[in-house]
């Protein structure tokens, strides 16, 4: 074999072998245990970044490991290729989104191949192709027929100048990104899928996700947000009107001093007809984007409507206020306000001089609401017939009374809202609904699917081409004129079922149930924790929809989930003449000085600018601290990049990019290459004969098999790839120091190397493939089996025992592995060093920890 490790040469040869032999293409095989390994597919932005490389390296390590376990492994890849960035790029580059997207796919596909990922490319999908989205459209029509799809008005960001809807990302400081016009909120009809119909099942089934991180499960539980409470009816004084309020704290009902309703509530709009101040407030609320996230931090404002609500139990009248912290699309659009026991209500009451009444007091201690509300549960007082009850007692008594009087009901509510899937954008899958001439809205007939998105378009940056082109919407259904829906699907739709399409990507149906049920559920899913509450919830929801449509048998889409951490890099900037920060790539920093703790104290870039170092932060375009994987692959080779990615940090934690660490990984591979090269150059004809081994040879062989056991557990069960690599590195140190003078010396090195290249194969497959062949194996490493631990090699002939006298180590003795306590005591007491410390004292106690420690207590 060649003496020098040449990554570009061997990686090209090995990748050609995989391509020519279709090594990673798989079909269903009832005789083999399957393993479906999937990393979240990328958006084709143009170039891979290190976050991609980390995600896909982890996936490839798991897939290759499982392959060597003898399993039938599916590892597919594709492209999440619809979305707003393509529209923006098309506008900037004066092209259409389609060619930009397809060009990026080709470029990134080659980058993935350069990194040596073992994908089944025959299953590649791109979600922007009609072959893919036709089945999404078909499924949507089936959901509509089942009553799981409906249309209602919902608020969107509206630019009055361009007369177009803006995505949240296109609103900058409350203004349109393009023309700087203040953005308004506008109610327009949109399509929704009833995810709330599955809220209880989605919540309960979280308990079955044993292989998912607790953090993700907690985030989903909170997002679904199940609560038990009471919905009650308040009358409106002086009218026959009434409205409903839901609360999880009916124990505080007797402390209500006002009611807050959303600006868009029918009662607010009614009162505004004779209240100009309220009308103005409602307009202001309409034009402010209020998400749930904003509610906690924004200033709480309100206007009295002049209306009064009638308390459902006491009959007392309390004022109704319109408030900006109540959302019409959340709950009933009205909340009962108990300032004595809710901090937000307390602050609002203080601001507007509204009464504050206490009705709950601590079980022990004094009640004090002079500075803040008392929000804990306690005992009721000032509550009439309910005085003295605790939370549970009051909940039941008040709920029972409201139910008995027909003024309320017990209710389970969910924080989860139905999924709004309409987007007023162009680059997405058209929603397959049509409006007939008489106004009836129906699904696009199956024989007219797919509704194809035209790709040869001109982007003007203002309106979606399919909205601007009035002819596109015109169609016919059963001989009647009709208009197509011009909204497109939320791109979370495509990523909610792609994993299932991989099972039968060429099928002339949404899924081939036989193939889908062979591969599903996914055995290992890998992606970022930032997807916990959106993609990963829709992913689970869609799987249940597919199940209920008879397309899959399982309840959940993925058995195990690994959420990899972010990749961080150093960030540097200087301030230019205009006072703006100019971020400099770490690759352009030529000089750095560090203090004795390794902190950067001075940095200069290639143009001589003195830089400010801001520390390690997430690789991003904005801070110009992204490292191009391709540059690193060209410099060090794909295996080095992969090895660094796996060794530098546990997979769930952040990874700090350090080129010195990459260089270290490269040196390790060169050491492995040299050890193999030196071994191959010798006469290795003598077979291993365990009966002939010396104690030193047995000890080395023991290290080999201990390493096999540790790496198998680290990769297979613990998924701690960094400690697996560390274990192999430690073994390599032993192997490099070991003699290769006798035939048995070399036989052990040979056994060790054939194990090491398989242990490292998932991580550095090109090197492992090549060395496997150079070591004389006739089969391909992909067809080999994972190394098996020889349990007999782990058995030790002798043990090293530490001997302590009065808690201090005085000697180390070697005893037979099966020596009993009496023998060990005798040897320990006879040791010269121990005798010295026992002279003239009486042994009071001897403690023996088998195989490890002999402790003597004497005085």
UniProtKB/Swiss-Prot annotation:
GO molecular function annotation: aminoacyl-tRNA deacylase activity; ATP binding; leucine-tRNA ligase activity
Compartments (UniProt record): Cytoplasm
Motif 'KMSKS' region: chain residues: 618-622
Enzyme class: ligase
Main localisation: cytoplasm
Keywords of the record: Aminoacyl-tRNA synthetase, ATP-binding, Cytoplasm, Ligase, Nucleotide-binding, Protein biosynthesis
Source organism superkingdom: Bacteria
Catalysis performed (reactions): tRNA(Leu) + L-leucine + ATP = L-leucyl-tRNA(Leu) + AMP + diphosphate
Entries under InterPro entries matching the protein: aa-tRNA-synth_I_CS, aa-tRNA-synth_Ia, Leu-tRNA-ligase, Leu_tRNA-synth_edit, M/V/L/I-tRNA-synth_anticd-bd, Methionyl/Leucyl_tRNA_Synth, Rossmann-like_a/b/a_fold, tRNAsynth_Ia_anticodon-bd
Chain span(s) of sequence motif 'HIGH' region: 42-52
Binding site for ATP: 621
Family note: Belongs to the class-I aminoacyl-tRNA synthetase family.
Protein name as catalogued: Leucine--tRNA ligase
Chain's gene name: leuS
